Structure formats: structure tokens, C-alpha cells
């Protein structure tokens, strides 16, 4: 796609599963990635991610989208945000429910099997790793693990935030833009 658009080099931001994909872009096509931001993601499954995603897969096989929706929200957002969202779980889950969960199952399985640990050190571009110390989906140590294996990395951990750090941290966008600008 980048070739078709005549993009020779890019600043890449990958969040959650998008961060897993962005890792492989930077590993396999280093000439295309000038700078990389990896937010609330991991380089290999850990106990937290395995437990959470395996539970979602069980719920998907039972076709229980409402419970997937609720569990995802409860594990993604801070209590402050959840107070706003909880009254709307029922209607939001109905509005966002897919026709079937096949794609969800494929994506969740991809997250469970993603393991770039042996290759992550091949990332050569400047990389900004961002996480939250209360991430209940990929775990709080996943960002540190990523940063420890990428030579030119900078690490930022937000206290009190979790998997929604990219949404709830007031300075997330400015931090990312500042990294890309420098």
C-alpha cells in the first residue's frame, strides 16, 4: 500500500493489536519506517494477555458479544470513564454487535499467537513505547519488555492508566507528535 501511494518513509503509530502489526512493518521493512510509536501493545503473549484473550475467545464461541463488550470495556478504561459508560453497555453492545464473530476470533487468535520477541531487536528506527501501569489486557510490564529489546527506544508509562492510555492520557497526542517532530 505504501508503494502504491508513493510513500517512501513514514512515521508509524501502532496501538494495541496495531502495535503488533507495526512491529512487523518495522522489522520486515526498516527502510519504510522513519520513527515508530508502539502504544499499549506487546512483543509476546504474557499471562495477562493469554487469560483475557482466551476468555474473549470462549465468549465468542458462545456468541456472547454483550459479555465480550462488557469485559473489554471493564478491562480497558479507568473507573472514572467506566462510570460514564456502564449505563449504556446494553445499548452500545447492541449497536456495535457484528453479524458474526468470525473476524473477532481470527484477530483474537492472532494476538494470542503474536510473538516477535526474537526479532524485536531488529527494529532500528527511533521508537517511543507507551503504556499504562494498570493495563489489564496486555499487562503493565509489556511496554518495559518492548523498550528493553529495542535499541533506540524511549519509554513512557502513565500512572493510573490502562489499555485506554491512548484515549485517556490528556497529553498522549502531544507526546506522540513531539516524538515525531524531534
Provide a role label for each language-model segment.
Residues 23, 27, 34-62:
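Flexible "cap/lid" loop of the alpha/beta hydrolase fold
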Residues 47-49, 67-119:
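Conserved alpha/beta-hydrolase catalytic His-Asp/Glu region
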Residues 123, 129-131, 135:
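Short beta-strand/loop motif that positions the catalytic acidic residue
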Residues 161-173:
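Catalytic histidine-centered segment of alpha/beta-hydrolase-like enzymes
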Amino acid at each position: 500500500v505504501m508503494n502504491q501511494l508513493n510513500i517512501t518513509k513514514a512515521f508509524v503509530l501502532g496501538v494495541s493489536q496495531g502495535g503488533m502489526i507495526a512491529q512487523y512493518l518495522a522489522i520486515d521493512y526498516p527502510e519504510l519506517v522513519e520513527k515508530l510509536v508502539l502504544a499499549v501493545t506487546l512483543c509476546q503473549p504474557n499471562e495477562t494477555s493469554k487469560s483475557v484473550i482466551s476468555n474473549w475467545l470462549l465468549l465468542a464461541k458462545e456468541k456472547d458479544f454483550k459479555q465480550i463488550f462488557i469485559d473489554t470495556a471493564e478491562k480497558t478504561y479507568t473507573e472514572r470513564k467506566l462510570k460514564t459508560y456502564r449505563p449504556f453497555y446494553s445499548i452500545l453492545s447492541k449497536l456495535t454487535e457484528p453479524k458474526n464473530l468470525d473476524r473477532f476470533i481470527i484477530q483474537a487468535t492472532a494476538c494470542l499467537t503474536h510473538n516477535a520477541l526474537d526479532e524485536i531487536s531488529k527494529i532500528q528506527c527511533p521508537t517511543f513505547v507507551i503504556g499504562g501501569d494498570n493495563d489489564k489486557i496486555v499487562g503493565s510490564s509489556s511496554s518495559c519488555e518492548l523498550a528493553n529489546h529495542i535499541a533506540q527506544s524511549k519509554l513512557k508509562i502513565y500512572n493510573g492508566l490502562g489499555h485506554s492510555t491512548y484515549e485517556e492520557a490528556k497529553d498522549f497526542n502531544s507526546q506522540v507528535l513531539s516524538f515525531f517532530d524531534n
